[in-house]
């Protein structure tokens, strides 16, 4: 569930959603124009308030996971991005504490970071309380590390799935674009997966079912060869 900032104050809406949402729920916290490290103190304060309120709303919905962005502006160099890491880890202290209190797992998603190495210090600073969410389209379109491999080395426990033409963040169905999910996604099918597509998701669901079937077939072959 994306927590649209334009609707975040609507109490009746969240009460209705809570009754209608079945099973496990994950949310995406607000991110537009937010940055805990903005040079503008007003933006820093607003960012903290929106993240904390978003976590409160997540708990109201019964969500067990909440994804957020680091807020890094697009086009930062690896050196600039790395310089942000420890200050960001410190600025996240109150957010991590609120998530812990509410019982919501906090997940940092790659967005405009140039490379995965700049996220590692943040994740390590809050080890055990902050996980990683991987979005392959963001890596391909926004970063200087388009290959999923280095990002997957961060050990994502949550993945946002969609496809892209490699130029824009299209949110296409899986298999329609250039991300090659069949080449790398199979070992992560046991993690929490969220489809983020802007079209009928049936094609993506069929893709995932077929990929899972290929994995089972390969596993069965290994068992047969081991006998």
Which functions belong to the PLM regions below?
Residues 1, 25-29, 66-68, 106-108, ...:
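Hydrophobic faces of well-ordered beta-strands that scaffold small-molecule active sites
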Residues 1-53, 59, 221-227:
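N-terminal pre-domain/capping segments
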Residues 1-13, 35-37, 74-76, 110-117, ...:
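Acidic-and-aromatic substrate-binding clefts and catalytic sites of carbohydrate-active enzymes
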Residues 8-29, 53-62, 96-101, 121-127, ...:
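Acidic (Asp/Glu)-rich catalytic clusters
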Residues 11-17, 43-51, 81-93, 143-151, ...:
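Charged helix-capping and loop-helix junction motifs
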Residues 31, 70-72, 163-165:
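Short, histidine-centered active-site or binding-site loop motifs used for metal coordination
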Residues 37-131, 219-223:
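Active-site acidic/histidine proton-transfer and metal-coordination neighborhood
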Residues 116-131, 140-227:
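Histidine-acidic metal/acid-base catalytic patches
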